[in-house]
């Protein structure tokens, strides 16, 4: 109790008060009430809203503050850094730990975990780190190595910070330890300056990243690149950061007060939370959410940070609405001022919809909305969703969630042909059907992968995690698709060669190609194994490259794989299809075309080919039919 007048005067007085309580009146709700250092109770809904990057209520929760909130601790998700690197630091294995990554990757949060296992922790007055000791070794932390400190310029700050390591080859010999979060570019710029006496460390870092971690680091040094962390990568317990964070933010102990709320059965926030923390079906719903997020990871358009992840989950749970806002929305529905279908947009399964009020400007949510599952048609299923009553037997069974939306959906599903509907009812009808589709994706009992916008996603996932035999088959498949994109559809030649058109000019009479032996190429998953021993990593792309000239390589993302998969099945892309995001394919082709060549293949109809070859010794040109023996 924080107020002196409310405290018991003595232990005896407290005991007498306790004895007056009937033990049958005691109730263990499992609810945790969290108060801040002023004694004020913290609202979980307000806290969740503060995590959303575009919150109208303030987004203070998106950044690690100088003082950690109780709910920050309660919802903190342990990562591999906490589980593996933390113990290695505690055991004295590393004296210098450098952490790079984007803003929001959790660098500061981890450094604070290190400080949490240390002794004699003293925060620096500049609020950019602390001094402490681990096993008697003095340490200093720096939360942001790119900023100036008080009257000192950044170069001066870094010079002093790295001073214990000047001239060392074995960093374990340093008398003091350091842990720093810093932008990789800024770090290398500083270290490469000869006057800073750290050019050797700059070379080590550069070689380490260039050789994808296969260059050995000096003893006592660890470099972590959080840009390689994936929020959908699974650990040994089959949990991802996404799954762990959802479970933390929807933990039942944090949401106990919702059970006695008068609007509990109609509140979309409670429905969302109860769905995701359900003991029976919650994990399955989260798995389907993981596949949706995995499409973003595999597209490689955005590195999803912990801040992005928490912002996304927050928006999915509350849509930036407070408890008072929910009451007002339900009153608007009751007063016919807001259509029920529009209120449905607030449920978690409509996270890929952009029809709620103003579209979100959060960068991850925008990508999710561009990948809307409601835009994928499955006629046989859609027909039943639109024209039949939805049956409980066709959906997941929830253990503790009390509310089902199916009766509400059935009641609102007015079946009229399009010609009988005005613009308003037609708009609501479309919104209703899209809600049915998205709800069915997350809670329906069926092959949900068919609803994902990328039909090759499952196959791509399998290739990324396949064996060497699978990779060899995939290499031939990709090479054939690239050949097809150049007009080389002949499977006999493409079985062993990659074909590239020798000219961009359309010839109405014939085609000409350069061929490259597939044995000169290799295909591998972008694993970065040596760089990710302390972080969650999931292979997100394939690397198709020349064995000798490794700079000639093509990074195959999900978008490109989907396009090549379509091409292999007969789709003939236009020039516009291959422009823009597929510019890397054109760069790869250009690099191959730049190699010296002495042969061209020509054909009138892509069936009968002729070889036109230059003899380098005699300088004579030989023309001969291409037969199967020369393939």
Indicate where each model-derived feature is located:
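Conserved nucleotide-sensing/catalytic segment adjacent to the nucleotide-binding pocket
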Residues: 133-179
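Long C-terminal appendages of very large multidomain proteins
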Residues: 404-631
């Amino acid at each position: 109790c924080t107020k002196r007048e409310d405290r018991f005067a003595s232990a005896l007085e407290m005991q007498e008060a306790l004895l007056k309580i009937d033990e049958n009146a005691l109730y263990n709700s499992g609810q945790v009430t969290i108060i801040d250092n002023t004694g004020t109770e913290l609202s979980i809904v307000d806290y969740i809203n503060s995590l959303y990057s575009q919150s109208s209520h303030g987004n203070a929760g998106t950044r690690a503050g100088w003082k950690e909130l109780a709910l920050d601790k309660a919802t903190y998700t342990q990562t591999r850094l906490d589980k593996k690197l933390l113990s290695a630091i505690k055991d004295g294995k590393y004296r210098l730990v450098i952490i790079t990554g984007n803003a929001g990757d959790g660098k500061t949060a981890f450094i604070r975990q290190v400080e949490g296992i240390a002794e004699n922790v003293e925060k620096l007055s500049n609020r950019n780190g602390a001094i402490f000791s681990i096993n008697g070794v003095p340490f200093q932390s720096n939360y942001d190595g790119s900023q100036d400190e008080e009257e000192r310029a950044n170069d001066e700050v870094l010079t002093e910070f790295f001073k214990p390591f000047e001239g060392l080859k074995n960093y374990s010999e340093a008398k003091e330890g350091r842990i720093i979060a810093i932008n990789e570019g800024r770090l290398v710029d500083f270290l490469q300056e000869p006057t800073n006496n750290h050019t050797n460390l700059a070379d080590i870092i550069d070689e380490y990243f260039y050789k994808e971690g296969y260059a050995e680091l000096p003893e006592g040094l660890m470099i972590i690149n959080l840009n390689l962390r994936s929020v959908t990568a699974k650990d040994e317990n089959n949990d991802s950061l996404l799954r762990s964070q959802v479970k933390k933010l929807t933990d039942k102990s944090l949401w106990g007060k919702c059970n006695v709320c008068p609007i509990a059965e109609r509140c979309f926030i409670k429905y969302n939370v109860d769905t995701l923390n359900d003991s029976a079906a919650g994990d399955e719903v989260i798995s389907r959410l993981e596949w949706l997020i995995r499409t973003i990871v595999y597209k490689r358009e955005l590195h999803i940070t912990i801040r992005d992840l928490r912002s996304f989950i927050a928006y999915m749970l509350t849509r930036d609405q407070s408890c008072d806002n929910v009451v007002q929305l339900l009153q608007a529905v009751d007063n016919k001022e807001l259509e029920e279908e529009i209120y449905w947009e607030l449920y978690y399964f409509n996270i890929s919809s952009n029809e709620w009020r103003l579209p979100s400007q959060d960068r991850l949510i925008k990508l999710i909305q561009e990948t809307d599952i409601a835009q994928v048609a499955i006629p046989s299923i859609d027909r039943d969703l639109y024209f039949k009553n939805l049956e409980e037997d066709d959906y997941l069974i929830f253990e503790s969630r009390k509310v089902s939306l199916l009766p509400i959906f059935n009641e609102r599903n007015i079946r009229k042909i399009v010609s009988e509907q005005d613009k308003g009812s037609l708009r609501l009808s479309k919104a209703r059907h899209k809600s049915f589709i998205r709800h069915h994706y997350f809670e329906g009992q069926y092959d949900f992968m068919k609803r994902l916008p990328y039909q090759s996603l499952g196959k791509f996932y399998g290739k990324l995690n396949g064996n060497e035999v699978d990779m060899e088959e995939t290499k031939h498949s990709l090479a054939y698709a690239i050949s097809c994109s150049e007009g080389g559809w002949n499977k006999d030649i493409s079985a062993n060669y990659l074909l590239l058109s020798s000219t961009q000019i359309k010839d109405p009479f014939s085609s000409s190609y350069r061929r490259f032996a597939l044995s000169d190429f290799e295909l591998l998953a972008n694993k970065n194994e040596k760089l990710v021993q302390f972080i969650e990593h999931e292979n997100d792309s394939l690397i198709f490259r020349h064995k000798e000239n490794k700079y000639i390589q093509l990074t195959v993302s999900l978008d490109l794989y989907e396009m090549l998969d379509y091409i292999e099945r007969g789709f003939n892309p236009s020039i516009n299809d291959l422009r823009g995001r597929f510019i890397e394919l054109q760069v790869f082709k250009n690099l191959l075309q730049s190699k010296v060549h002495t042969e061209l293949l020509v054909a009138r109809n892509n069936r009968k080919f002729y070889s036109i070859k230059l003899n380098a010794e005699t300088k004579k040109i030989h023309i001969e039919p291409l037969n199967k023996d020369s393939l």
